[in-house]
Swiss-Prot record:
A motif (Nuclear localization signal 2 (NLS2)) lies at residues 184-247. This is Polymerase acidic protein. GO terms for biological process: cap snatching; DNA-templated transcription; symbiont-mediated suppression of host gene expression; symbiont-mediated suppression of host mRNA transcription via inhibition of RNA polymerase II activity; viral RNA genome replication; viral translational frameshifting. Influenza RNA polymerase is composed of three subunits: PB1, PB2 and PA. Interacts (via C-terminus) with PB1 (via N-terminus). The gene is PA.
Length: 716
């Protein structure tokens, strides 16, 4: 390697390199790779400066050798290559004459045109890793960093490369030549592997032993050791990094980073079309319960027994008829299905002993409603691959739907309080540590705020229905089992209550894969007249089945009772998540907890008690066309819970896509509000990605509308 250095580099450069090594107590004859690295670095610094001058007008010009204008001022002052004392003298002189901030470490050059010190780096590793090591060492925004690699890559602070392209190309070509020459002599591998990271003069917390091994094993794939990753993270400067990467891409990539101002974003475009319709697996605000208080009947707790007992509390049954037909369905079949349920329940009551489960007779109306024998026959691919016109099953694009007011009403209703308690506080033992005491206190306060909430009723209803349906799907695969839709709660006085919302009839359920579908028919009681918002009930056939006497301010009034019937379907994986809807409580509690933590860190003490008991304070709940809505801490708890519950009830690919893409836009707007001067490229593409998720889902359309309200008020 020593011979190579003496042949390859100018003798003056070699002499300077040897002198520098001796100054640091290193032997150039032993540490030959270090000698080669210093020579390379010196040569790059000299090439960086060569031919660059400043004319009398203060403009930067390039002057080739032999030009008569030798009296021009050099653009760059070379600091690298001088002995330390002299180098610091030059730096101090520059700082005194230009007013530049004195750097902590000796830089390599000073640029009189841009008035900044420059640190030049030449690396055998990845440019961005070396760049970040340099940035982490220097810790100064005033010193400009410019890194070159032997592979032709480069990286500079804020992607400002200082020199013209031709000058940089000269440097890159020289580095590539050095690499080729080393490789031809078998010296490159040793030279490449000998590079160490930048050493900073600061104490480091050393991780050793097992923890060190685990740390090294846990790194992202591009990093060989913890130090590289630490340097990368500490010095990461996203804007400059992105611009640097863009500049290295093919010329076909023309992504320009545009500044993002208050006037930049436009509202998200919501689709036009007929109003969206209800698509939840069970009725929400429109559900009606037949209830029994303090149940103590024989077989109490067995769903079928409970259902029959609830049905007996109602005396206003009448001959059912269709009041709102399903546009595409055979409505008489829905009517016959309900009549069959009533008849078979009557048969059970006539028996001496009521069975624990009820399998419905496989009548023509139920076979139709449950899609029996409707699935296309599956054929082995080998038996049909010779069919000439074999093609994928054709399906229409989904029809675009517009936002309808009913979904906002549903959400508002979910945030309201009911007159029942839907969750009990579990006994989980005494608190031991102080943190457990704080956790219990928060949980108790939160539970008190949400236990009466309608969203909590939806959770318990969803858990019950999905559990019962999954059990029946596994236990009675071939049967059309009748499954009562039940929930349990306590009254304000603490009395137990069992509620019946209606029935489900399950179809054949040979569910092998998580996504295999089981069909079911749902029949749910309601007092809502479907003719008021027919678009909401597009997927339903609605029957009038009785008259209910209700107490009102003017005495008893009779109201028609309806039955909402529809064919629906679900899968094992959807039922599994439905059974775990209680997680919504945890998610919203965690969101409230982060608000308490923020408050506590400001006040430097736990603020849980004050947070929940200061009834006069209001908190932001969300955006509406009127502005930022505010409410009590209880209202915040219930709103966050309702959002989480609706995310579960209306889960869909459209929601996944909208949440992921709109979050990017939200972060950009948030950065603007925090005065971080965000930049974007292809903002149109981001809007496209957001808007392609707005098709027909009511919950997604409502979220998009809320997002537009947020944009309006956030950017005022």
């Amino acid at each position: 390697m020593e011979d190579f250095v003496r042949q390859c580099f100018n003798p003056m450069i070699v002499e300077l390199a040897e002198k520098a090594m001796k100054e640091y107590g290193e032997d150039p004859k032993i540490e030959t790779n270090k000698l080669a690295a210093i020579c390379t670095h010196l040569e790059v610094c000299f090439m960086y400066s060569d031919f660059h001058f400043i004319n009398e007008q203060g403009e930067s010009i390039i002057v080739e050798l032999g030009d008569p204008n030798a009296l021009l001022k050099h653009r760059f002052e070379i600091i690298e290559g001088r002995d330390r004392t002299m180098a610091w003298t030059v730096v101090n002189s520059i700082c005194n004459t230009t007013g530049a901030e004195k750097p902590k470490f000796l830089p390599d050059l000073y640029d009189y045109k841009e008035n900044r010190f420059i640190e030049i780096g030449v690396t055998r590793r990845e440019v961005h890793i070396y760049y970040l090591e340099k940035a982490n060492k220097i810790k100064s925004e005033k010193t400009h960093i410019h890194i070159f690699s032997f592979t032709g890559e480069e990286m500079a602070t804020k992607a400002d490369y200082t020199l013209d392209e031709e000058s940089r190309a000269r440097i890159k070509t020289r580095l590539f030549t050095i690499r080729q020459e080393m490789a031809s002599r078998g010296l490159w591998d040793s030279f490449r592997q000998s590079e160490r990271g930048e050493e900073t003069i600061e104490e480091k917390f050393e991780i050793t032993g097992t923890m060190r091994k685990l740390a090294d094993q846990s790194l992202p794939p591009n990093f060989s050791c913890l130090e590289n990753f630490r340097a990368y993270v500490d010095g990461f400067e996203p804007n400059g990094y992105i611009e640097g990467k863009l500049s290295q891409m093919s010329k076909e990539v023309n992504a320009r980073i545009e500044p993002f101002f208050k006037t930049t974003p436009r509202p998200i475009r919501l689709p036009d079309g007929p109003p969206c319709s209800q698509r939840s697996k069970f009725l929400l605000m429109d559900a009606l319960k037949l209830s029994i208080e303090d149940p103590s009947h024989e077989g109490e707790g067995i769903p079928l027994y409970d259902a029959i007992k609830c049905m007996r509390t109602f005396f206003g049954w009448k001959e059912p008829y269709v009041v709102k037909p399903h546009e595409k369905g055979i409505n008489p079949n829905y009517l016959l299905s309900w009549k069959q349920v009533l008849a078979e329940l009557q048969d059970i009551e006539n028996e001496e002993k009521i069975p624990k489960t009820k399998n419905m007779k496989k009548t023509s109306q139920l076979k139709w409603a449950l899609g029996e024998n409707m699935a296309p026959e599956k054929v082995d691919f080998d038996d049909c691959k010779d069919v000439s016109d074999l093609k994928q099953y054709y399906s229409d694009e989904p029809e675009l739907r517009s936002l309808s007011s009913w979904i906002q009403n549903e959400f508002n209703k979910a945030c309201e309080l009911t007159d029942s308690v839907w969750i009990e506080l579990d006994e989980i033992g005494e608190d031991v540590a102080p943190i457990e005491h704080i956790a219990s206190m928060r949980r108790n306060y939160f539970t008190a705020e949400v236990s009466h909430c309608r969203a909590t009723e939806y959770i318990m209803k969803g858990v019950y229905i999905n559990t019962a349906l999954l059990n029946a799907s596994c236990a009675a695969m071939d049967d059309f089992q009748l499954i009562p839709m039940i929930s349990k709660c306590r009254t304000k006085e603490g009395r137990r209550k069992t509620n019946l919302y209606g029935f489900i009839i399950k179809g054949r359920s040979h569910l092998r894969n998580d996504t295999d579908v089981v069909n079911f028919v749902s029949m749910e009681f309601s007092l809502t007249d479907p003719r008021l918002e027919p678009h909401k009930w597009e997927k339903y056939c609605v029957l009038e089945i009785g008259d209910m006497l209700l107490r009102s301010a003017i005495g008893q009034v009779s109201r028609p009772m309806f039955l909402y019937v529809r064919t629906n379907g679900t899968s094992k994986i959807k039922m599994k998540w439905g059974m775990e809807m209680r997680r919504c409580l945890l998610q919203s509690l965690q969101q409230i907890e982060s608000m308490i933590e923020a408050e506590s860190s400001v006040k430097e003490k736990d603020m849980t008690k004050e947070f929940f008991e200061n009834k006069s304070e209001t908190w932001p709940i969300g955006e509406s066309p009127k502005g930022v809505e505010e409410g009590s801490i209880g209202k915040v708890c219930r709103t966050l819970l309702a959002k989480s519950v609706f995310n579960s009830l209306y889960a869909s690919p459209q929601l996944e896509g909208f949440s992921a893409e709109s979050r990017k836009l939200l972060l950009i707007v948030q950065a603007l509000r925090d005065n971080l001067e965000p930049g974007t490229f292809d903002l149109g593409g981001l809007y496209e990605a957001v808007e392609e998720c707005l098709i027909n889902d009511p919950w997604v359309l409502l979220n998009a509308s809320w997002f537009n309200s947020f944009l309006t008020h956030a950017l005022r």
